[in-house]
Amino acid sequence: VFGDLDLIGVIGEGSAAASVDGTWYGSLDAVDAASGYWVQSNVDGTVDVCGDPADDVVYTLHDANNLISYSYGESQAIGDALPDNVEDEVFAIVGEGIASINMNGFWVGSLNSFDAGSGYWFARSADAADITFQYNVPTAGDARLLSNELPVVPEEYVYNQSTEQGFYFVE
């Protein structure tokens, strides 16, 4: 499924797989268009996903944390991408090194838009009922000038992104 990048691991919601000498081990044995995945590699590169585009993916969000994909090829602002009834049910969204919290219907934080090919953790209350949704179809100009690009870090402060990240939302 993944292109020619030299991957050492793939993490999904409640599953993972690691490559040891070219053989994959773990509980993750297939990928699903509706699920999100974080991939690990020893080298910088772009992950090419091989297969048919999946723009009409239906997602089901259960209570607590959900790792899901963003299936469109165009970036889209959070508020434009999510149907209103879903926005009301999600209190935070976390990406790789970025996050936003829903403050009375406004998304506040470093995550401004969903990017093509990315996975996101959607946080919901622990007792929430399942909801099913599809992202709104992007239209020209949806992502306007929004960007999730973080500032360049000076060389002496460069770090490796951890899969064990934490975010704290302080009022």
Residue positions per predicted region:
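N-terminal exported-region signature
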Residues: 1-164
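Aromatic/hydrophobic beta-strand junction motif of beta-rich domains
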Residues: 168-171
